[in-house]
Amino acid sequence: MILEVVVYNIESALKAQAGGADRIELCDNPLEGGTTPSFGVIEGVRQNVSMDLYVMIRPRGGDFVYNNYDFYAMKRDIDQCMKLSADGVVFGILTPEARMDVKRCRELIQRARPMKVTCHRAFDVTRDAFEAHRHRFRLVCSRPRNPPASPSISPAGFSRFA
């Protein structure tokens, strides 16, 4: 089993590594549910930890329906994560109808290669979790991310996807 820890700064990344984490997910703005951290923080973490580093790609808090400006920022953030040697990125995009935005997700997944991609909390709030799961496999998203306290998919319910 892989232990992943969500961290918000360099100090917490170092503590996660010292505590035996296998991988970290680096975010900013915990009160907003996590957003993209600054490039300086990403670089500082990468220079100071040896475990896998996944970076949240989320331009703002709130919903997961992004306009063209948000989507542009997400593409550029992925480019920067690649330059900063992140091992993976974490994102999710929904349509206004609360379905996975397959077209935009596919574009970001292709842009992120060879980094790995994790589908994040947007997966939890889709109208149809089974449909989203099917899309995730078709898109070749590395893995879903479901927080332990997810209100929409309980640990028992998640076994339906296995």
PLM-predicted stretches and their roles:
Residues 1-9, 57-75, 118-129:
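Active-site mouth loops of central-metabolism enzymes
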Residues 3-5, 24-26, 45, 53-57, ...:
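Hydrophobic faces of well-ordered beta-strands that scaffold small-molecule active sites
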Residues 10-14, 18, 30-54, 68-72, ...:
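Active-site-adjacent beta->alpha loops and helix N-cap segments on the catalytic face
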Residues 19, 48, 84, 138-140:
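Structural motif
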Residues 76-93, 97:
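Ordered, amphipathic secondary-structure segments that act as subunit-interaction surfaces
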Residues 141-151:
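His/Asp/Glu-enriched short active-site or ligand-binding loop at hydrolase and phosphoryl-transfer sites
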